[in-house]
Amino acid sequence: MKLLWKLHSGLPREGPGSDEATKRVLSLLPQRRFTRILDVGCGPGMQTLCLARCLAGNIVAVDNHQPYLDVLASNAKAEHFESRVETLNASMDALPFDDGTFDLIWSEGAIYCMGFEQGLNLWRRLLTANGIVVVSELTWLSSNPPEESRRFWKRNYPAMESLEGNTKLVAGSGYELLATYLLPSKAWFRDYYDPLERRIDLFSEKYGRDAALLAELNAAREEIDLFRRYHNVYGYVFYAMQRGLLPEAKGTP
């Protein structure tokens, strides 16, 4: 397990994404001043720093792996954001905040850890009355994906939904969908897959006699190769949502 953490340590990101994508999604939100922002599953915080550059509010960045938080804290200090970026080691399904604390919740590539619908339901109480949540979620882009890709994701993320399916979950969880944005395929590679693949090559040479680790490395390589072949079949979609009424409350006097 320590070697697997080492495999990922020092990568720019812990999942697909880019500053350009983060800024693009921010441009799709209603133009308002966000004063209290929560970044859930922040990892080493590349998107956290992008949010800090683009927004004037205070940010709480949450992850349950302290080394990632240490990297973020160091980088935030280097950019003079230490007064606005706070790190917190906590679980995303037990966030220690009062109701209505945040006017913007952001989470890139992390909500899958607890499930899209469950995350939306649990985080909703943390938002102000008209607060906004933005998440990127792995999403089927084809109604009939090739069998190889279907088998892989059934094994690794069986809860993956289509855009239509996630849109229904958004409404059922008490949100108004404001916008969606498909992460460009190039944003999977520059800061994530490309450096990860180089690390996989190095680890394969160094630890090739460790059968268990080699199996993990091969699984990571399989994921990268799969996306090269099927990037038009699935991808990360950003969902920007505003807190609204729960379905059962609509129409209530």
Label the model's feature ranges.
Residues 15-33:
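Conserved alpha-helix/loop element of class I SAM-dependent methyltransferases that forms part
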Residues 118-132:
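A short glycine-rich, Lys/Arg-flanked "PGG" loop and its adjoining helix->strand segment in the class I
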Residues 38, 46-94:
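Class I SAM-dependent methyltransferase SAM/SAH-binding core
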Residues 159-174:
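Short alpha-helix
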Residues 104-117:
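A short SAM/SAH-binding and catalytic strip from SAM-dependent methyltransferases
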